[in-house]
């Protein structure tokens, strides 16, 4: 089965089945500058959630919107915020923070800020937006806040720090509070932060809650911050055909590497691919595995600096590399085992309150019917084959390495919760990865919710997409629950038809490479990557803020392998290919530069040196090149002797009298002139 698809369309911001064709932005009474910006962004008609929420929010209503990813929730609150800021500026020039947008992750801070900049494109001088999700210190961010922005985008934790330090004042000027991805905000443990923020808000403040699911926690949050809200539910007809094709394939742990290599090598997977793994170690293990086979890729995880993470997402979206390995650690925040059961119970409850104004929208969230159950403990996977791999690493320091490896073995089964990763990192949900053709769950998600969020990174807008999940025996029970949930929601998670015996010829290469990727190799790769990204991060802070075009000079898909990667691994001999592919397969994968030269990232310095030496060696064997004689030149014996004499005189710097008439030189001995003199001289017998 071939996973490839043709997808040349530009990604729309909202799925076509969620567009309200009966409504226009012009009919909402929006500022002309906003309308021009929306047109520039390609917005023709509002989405269903936008057509209902924007008029209500402009009337001052609190909004609780439940809608799936890709339904246009961000524009549903950004448009009325900018409209109200412009209206306030016409009445008064008093500076003050007019709106605060809270998001769960630092990655979303940058994305939401960029969206605000797009909507306010023609009025940027009047509407200032600051995001506090970067890695600047509180003191550095004070400079950004000194001019008092109109809109602040932040994570709850960082906003609390500024409120407690009194660098942000909200009591007298704040008009709107938005909590985007409200269910995820609570999952990340921000409940206490929300309570603190609430104490700094004015008594009268319009609030938005945007969420993909309505859990009990969201209901409690609704009571805390909303007053007589309009509740918008996106109800989707199950019969609607999805653009997403979902597949799963059961395999052993080691076979995941065999499968991913074979699918890429045989061109069964092509295009822009997003790989999800469950922890940082697996992230670098998969990257090192790809590098051994000269496959370019980049990694995205919580240990990288936030500026580098932003830039990696930007470069991936621009198509500078096609393979991105992302660590999804969101399951760590799902500590409450009742969470998914509560979600199911809540979906069946009547959300109508006596004080609530209900507005039903025509589509239903594909996550509405999730009967998700937490399954963290039974689905944790052991790290594979580390014991065998360690024996291959750096034999010269055996004693020292054995001690380190023993420590690694003791700690290898521990969760990585205590890593130095950013607690506000998250990419499986909300992040706009553009034009992703295939999502590969290299490590199967820990929960049903995580599965749904991951596969939502593809098939966005009107585009088609494919989700492929590798399932080991640890995950088979969870796979059954995922399949049931997706089936109940009107989707079909199908088994992937693939004959493993057809790729057995690749097994020895894959397993040989895996033996070289032990714990030490992974640790070294992490150190190398972190050092490089820290360097990139410093550059990003200063120069690249003023020269965004120079971002192309930074590469996040460079190789982490210090040693020369065997060149024979970049090609696969024809005898290893399955019969049906021998006449079609391209013999080469995309090649990683083994050692970039300064000033030219795409050239391999070492390979050039090797080629030069080979050329010199061939030249020495070719008498015509040695004597500087062109090919197809006719020479007499005497002329050849003269040419050889000139060559000897030039190369050996000997006197003409020491050369015989036939062009050969007389027998000579090499003799040192003295013990302290390294010069040699020729003595003629």
Curated annotation (Swiss-Prot):
Gene Ontology terms, MF aspect: ATP binding; ATP hydrolysis activity; RNA binding; RNA helicase activity
Q motif, short sequence motif: residues: 23-51
Transmembrane segments: none
EC number, UniProt record: 3.6.4.13
Keyword set includes Membrane: no
Family: Belongs to the DEAD box helicase family. DDX56/DBP9 subfamily.
Name of the protein in question: Probable ATP-dependent RNA helicase ddx56
Organism: Dictyostelium discoideum (Social amoeba)
């Amino acid at each position: 089965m071939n996973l490839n698809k043709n997808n040349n369309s530009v990604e729309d911001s909202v799925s076509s089945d969620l567009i309200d064709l009966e409504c226009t932005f012009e009919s909402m009474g929006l500022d002309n500058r906003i309308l021009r910006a929306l047109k520039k962004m390609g917005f023709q008609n509002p989405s269903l959630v936008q057509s209902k929420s924007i008029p209500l929010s402009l009337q001052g209503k609190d909004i609780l919107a439940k809608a799936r990813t890709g339904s246009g929730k961000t524009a549903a609150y950004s448009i009325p915020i900018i409209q109200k800021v412009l209206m306030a500026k016409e009445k008064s020039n008093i500076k003050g923070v007019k709106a605060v947008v809270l998001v769960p992750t630092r990655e979303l801070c940058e994305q939401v800020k960029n969206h605000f900049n797009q909507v306010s494109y023609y009025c940027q001088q009047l509407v200032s937006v600051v995001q506090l999700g970067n890695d600047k210190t509180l003191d550095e961010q004070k400079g950004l806040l000194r001019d008092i922005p109109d809109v602040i985008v932040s994570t709850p934790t960082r906003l609390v720090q500024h409120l407690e330090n009194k660098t942000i004042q909200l009591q007298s000027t704040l008009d709107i509070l938005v909590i985007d991805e409200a269910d995820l905000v609570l999952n990340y443990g921000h409940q206490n932060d929300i309570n603190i923020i609430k104490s700094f808000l004015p008594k009268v403040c319009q609030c938005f809650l945007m969420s993909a699911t309505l859990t009990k926690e969201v209901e409690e949050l609704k009571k805390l911050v909303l007053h007589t809200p309009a509740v918008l539910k996106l109800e989707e007809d199950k019969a609607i055909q999805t653009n997403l094709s979902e597949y799963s394939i059961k395999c052993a742990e080691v076979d995941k590497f065999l499968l991913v290599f074979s699918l890429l090598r045989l061109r069964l997977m092509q295009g822009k691919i997003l790989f999800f793994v469950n922890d940082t170690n697996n992230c670098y293990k998969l990257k090192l595995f790809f590098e051994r086979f000269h496959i370019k890729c980049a990694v995205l995880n919580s240990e990288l600096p936030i500026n580098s993470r932003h830039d990696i997402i930007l470069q991936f979206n621009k198509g500078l590399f096609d393979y991105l390995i992302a660590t999804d650690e969101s399951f760590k925040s799902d500590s409450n085992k009742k969470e998914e059961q509560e979600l199911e119970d809540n979906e069946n409850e009547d959300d109508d309150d006596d004080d609530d104004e209900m507005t039903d929208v025509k589509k239903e969230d594909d996550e509405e019917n999730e009967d998700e159950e937490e399954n963290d403990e039974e689905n944790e996977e052991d790290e594979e084959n580390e014991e065998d791999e360690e024996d291959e690493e750096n034999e010269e320091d055996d004693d020292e390495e054995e001690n380190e490896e023993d420590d690694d073995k003791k700690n290898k089964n521990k969760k990585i919760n205590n890593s130095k990763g950013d607690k506000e990192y998250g990419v499986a949900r909300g992040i706009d990865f553009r034009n992703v053709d295939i999502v590969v769950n290299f490590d199967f998600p820990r929960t049903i919710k995580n599965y749904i969020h991951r596969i939502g990174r593809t098939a966005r807008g009107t585009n088609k997409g494919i989700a492929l999940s590798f399932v080991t025996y640890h995950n088979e029970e969870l796979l059954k629950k995922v399949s049931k949930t997706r089936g109940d929601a009107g989707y079909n998670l199908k088994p992937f038809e693939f004959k493993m015996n057809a790729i057995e010829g690749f097994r020895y290469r894959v397993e040989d490479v895996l033996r070289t990727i032990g714990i030490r190799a992974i640790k070294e790769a992490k150190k190398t990557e972190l050092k490089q990204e820290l360097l990139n991060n410093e550059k990003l802070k200063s120069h690249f803020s003023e020269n965004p075009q120079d971002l192309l000079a930074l590469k996040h898909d460079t190789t982490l392998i210090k040693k020369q990667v065997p060149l024979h691994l970049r090609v696969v001999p024809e005898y290893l290919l399955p019969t049906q592919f021998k006449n079609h397969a391209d013999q080469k994968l995309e090649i990683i530069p083994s050692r970039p030269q300064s000033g030219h990232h795409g050239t391999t310095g070492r390979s050039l040196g090797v080629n030069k030496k080979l050329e010199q060696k061939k030249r020495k064997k070719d008498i015509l090149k040695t004597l500087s004689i062109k090919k197809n030149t006719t020479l007499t014996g005497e002329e050849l002797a003269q040419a050889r004499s000139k060559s000897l005189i030039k190369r050996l710097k000997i006197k003409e009298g020491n050369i015989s008439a036939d062009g050969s030189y007389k027998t000579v001995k090499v003799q040192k002139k003295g013990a302290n003199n390294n010069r040699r001289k020729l003595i003629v017998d």
